[in-house]
Amino acid sequence: MLAALVRTATISIFPKWFAPFIVLTAVCVSASVNANIVALDKGGKPVQAYLPTDVTYNPDIPTPESVLGANIGQWHVRHDQLTHYMRVLADHSDRISLEVTGRTHENRELLLLTITAPSNRPNIESMRTAHIDAMNSGEKVKAGAPLIFYMGYSIHGNEPSGSNAALALAYYLAAGQGARIDALLNNNIVLLDPSFNPDGLSRFAQWANMHKGKQLVADSNTREHDEGWPSGRTNHYWFDLNRDWLLLAHPESQARIKQFHRWRPHILTDFHEMGTDSTYFFQPGVRSRKNPITPDENVTLTEALAAYHAKAFDKQGKLYFSEEAFDDFYAGKGSTYPDLHGSIGILFEQASSRGHIQESINGPLAFSTTIANQITTSLSTFEGALANKPAILDYQSAFVKDTQALAKDGDISGYIVGESSDSGRFNAMLSLLKQHNIKFEVVSKDSDVGKQTFNANRAIYIPVAQAQYRLITSIFSTQTSFENNTFYDVSSWNMAMAFNLPFSVVEKRDTRNVKTAANAKLAMPVLSESLPASAYAYAFSWNDYYAPALLQSLLEAGVSVRSSENAFEAKLVNNQRHTFTSGSIVIPTGLVQPENLLSLLTEQARALRIPVYALASGLTPTGSDIGSRSIKPILGPKVLLVGGEGVSEYEVGEMWHYFDTRVGLPASIVEQQKLGNALQSGYTHIVFASGQYTLSDDTKDALFNWVKNGGVLIGQKSALRYFAANEWLNVDIVDREEIDSQFDEDKLTFGDKSALYARKLVAGAVYEAEIDITHPLFYGYTDTTLSMFKTSNMVVNNYYTPFTTPARYTSAPLLAGFSDEKLVKLIAETPAVITTQQGKGVVIGFTDNTQFRGYWYGTNKMLSNAIYQSGFLK
């Protein structure tokens, strides 16, 4: 019609020689209206294009593309799509059973597929228990015993090639037919965990998919390849779950470790991604950087499996590398934790497309290629393991026997750990030990060990003569000298130090000093069945780990609450007396209180297991009376965490996690670019994590005025540099050049460069600080020394101003882990915590991370004190 109209117009108004040009124009217009641009590369391939061609596939098993409506790699699979397909496979295949092992913080299912030949299904539980019995006894298993594989994918959500490869692998195991599949499944068991980190995977899938057009863009500058804050690497609270295998701060890790100990697999795979310009890495890593408690035979078997990965990539002409860059030292990551249990943990690292396609020095890297490579090494793992099956079976039994011999021949009989004055921290540690299948006994008589007294029923003894000898040795290590000083992650994770609990090594010659009994029970806090309504006031100590949570619940309910600056002794309604330390919380009944105060207080205290005392009078036998000005009101805080581009998502996430899950405090997270606008919203506390801050001059001025008008500004680690540069915090930080000057570079070769760099770092080590327990930032602490976790070589110049440096590193501060002696000397006796009063407000600086990975319970309360007890600093 359009062409006809144009032809008509041409006849009437244009000369005949012009008509062809008009008609051509009409044709072009008509074509553009009806055009359907076809993408040259949609990305992705049908599932069988990823899989071996010498295998046939059962046509009754649905393919991923038939269920999801797209080829694998065409889009980034979301977790809901992934789980849907796994359920479809389980419904259609008699090889697969599916179990929901837990849920993430965002309520996504954690799935585990158990895959084996149908003939094994009736006997699957007896096969599992026989394997566990052999692991417990160390008896050599028969040659026909099954291998158990735990195939795990994408613990970092923005490293998605693993979980997308799991689609193809699951199909292969469900639908594949022939000798290769029979050899794998007839007498072996595959546990498939398709997504270690569902929340992060879904976050990144949304990012990558929302930026994909019909034409794939390989430009590394495009927004698809420049992920926003926070990244999909982390879980809901922005934690790196590949550091949580030991720490178990999150439900994803707790569920996974439960299944690990239920099955004790022979091989566990851990699929990752790395920089786009890299190639492909598979273990073993740097041999000299493996954990020394891991047997050398583990590396030998890993090398044997590596030969099969290499053979597969050689056949495809793919680039790869091994035995460099990555280590196997930290016990809390996916390729190392299994090694300490007689399993073979294997790390795989694929160069990342970080989207659907990206340019690299090796040419365009398509998402489908990254998926294909992860499938290749998944299959080569099966091939290599079956070829080395007798050696792998023998290794696990030898591991058990060797572990028993190490415990028997060593000088240490065990470790003793005391409760201190805080049952909350102590019980949290006990829960962690139980989840790792570590056995302990209750100390039944007062025991003197290592110049410390451990009280009966308030301490545990952990004998090393048990299956978890290697893990126990690792988590209580105080090693400070290492063969290789380069660490991919931290160099210490001492559990007793993390929980700030007294502990001691028990040498075999001192075992008689530790008395335990099978019927001994740990002392529990004495909790009132009901509190008397006639009390003058109620009070509870600030010592317990969960005291801030009880306080916050009361503030949320509108309870009028006060905190005591000084210790006092009070008369109780039961005619007894009780001493309350500084920071104790007092609830006077004479003030306006909610009608349900009594039931609220009783319910919350019992839930948190915190003793609450009923006071008979406001007149105290010693110390401040209840109406004293030194017992100050605490108002409900309104806390802002500064986040956004440039700020450490890990540290912000750790603080958010602490406030949200352990205190019950609803903190706001505001991007630094929007901080200026937020300052008028009534925040009482603003917290800066490590980061690169670029606040405007107007925002900085407004923030400083906010402090001077009564606000509390808190910073940690590198945020202190920013505070110092703006003269908010009275602190002088040692220049990086001065730190570098401490290290002699004369006669060093180019090959020494990496080792020198490693010496200048603090490789996640434990440092001891001397603390002022009369200072509000340390209310609730009873010992004058505290183990702090240090991951930075930032040093505050030593200075002394009364009352403003309540924590300093000791003269010999290194307790565990690696730090070069030059750094240790620089850090010794320097401030660890600094405060500066500014007008009506205060600025607080922590040189270390008080919330490290949700594990360092011992320093957590410093942050709560900065929130709830900071009124005493103004």
Which role fits each region the language model picked out?
Residues 260-274:
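Proline-aspartate-enriched helix->loop->beta-strand connector
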Residues 1-15:
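N-terminal secretory signal peptides that target proteins for export/translocation
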Residues 194-198, 208, 271-279, 719:
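Short, solvent-exposed turn/loop segments enriched in Gly/Ser/Thr/Pro and often Arg
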Residues 170, 187-210:
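Carboxylate/His-rich catalytic cores and anion/metal-binding grooves
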